[in-house]
Curated annotation (Swiss-Prot):
Function: Regulator of peptidoglycan synthesis that is essential for the function of penicillin-binding protein 1B (PBP1b).
Pfam families per record: LpoB
Spans annotated as Disordered: 26-59
Domain of life: Bacteria
Family: Belongs to the LpoB family.
Key word Membrane present: yes
Gene expressing this chain: lpoB
Protein name, per record: Penicillin-binding protein activator LpoB
Subcellular location(s) of the protein: Cell outer membrane
Organism: Pantoea ananatis (strain LMG 20103)
GO function term, MF aspect, one: enzyme regulator activity
Lineage: Bacteria, Pseudomonadati, Pseudomonadota, Gammaproteobacteria, Enterobacterales
Length: 198
């Protein structure tokens, strides 16, 4: 009986294994490689070198004759203001409320030049102004541009008056407004208007 099981098992194995025989596939054909000649790059046609474009000119600032523009207003203020001779005056940097760039430093210098040796006011020097701005933590280039800042700075400098100026309207021909203010109260004691001259 053991023999018949062995024979039956062997026969069974032979049948199973005979069913697993697969078709043999042909190996993929091997193609011999041909040496490839290196491809020469196609020369690109020379591109024209772009010509430099002219640099556009920045818009020119309109030249305003600040001395001629501010002198009549300053003369009017000195005649009209009833102040004690020798009173200390802080000239605030002109505020630009025009529609463009304004030469604010030149305008402020023209106001200061017109006020020099007028007999009524002693001007705060630029050194004193820079020192006071530093003490208050303001940038040396800070244009105060507000009456409250200007009055606060004037109090720090022991000035009695502040001249607050504004340029308004078209930058080519701005309207100038000046206001002389009493530092102690902030009261405007004189105000004048004029048109800048080219």
């Amino acid at each position: 009986m053991i023999r018949s099981v062995n024979r039956t098992g062997a026969l069974m194995m032979a049948l199973i294994l005979s069913g697993c025989v697969m078709k043999q596939q042909q190996p993929a054909p091997v193609e011999p490689t041909q040496p490839v000649e290196p491809v020469q790059p196609v020369p690109q046609p020379e591109q024209p070198i772009p010509q430099p474009q002219p640099v556009p000119q920045p818009p020119k600032l309109v030249t305003i004759n600040w001395d001629a523009s501010v002198e009549p207003l300053v003369a009017q203020m000195v005649r009209a203001a009833t102040v004690t001779p020798g009173s200390v005056l802080l000239v605030d940097r002109i505020k630009n409320s025009t529609n463009g760039a304004l030469q604010g430093e030149k305008a402020t210098s023209a106001i200061q030049n017109a006020l020099n040796n007028n007999g009524k006011f002693t001007l705060v020097s630029s050194e004193q102004l820079a020192q006071a701005k530093q003490t208050l933590g303001l940038s040396p280039d800070d244009s105060l541009n507000s009456r409250s800042k200007a009055i606060g700075l004037a109090r720090n400098l022991n000035a009695q008056y502040v001249l607050y100026s504004t340029a308004k309207g078209d930058v080519k021909s701005p309207t100038l407004q000046m206001q002389l203010m009493l530092v102690q109260t902030g009261e405007i004691i004189w105000s004048g208007n004029g048109v800048a001259q080219n």
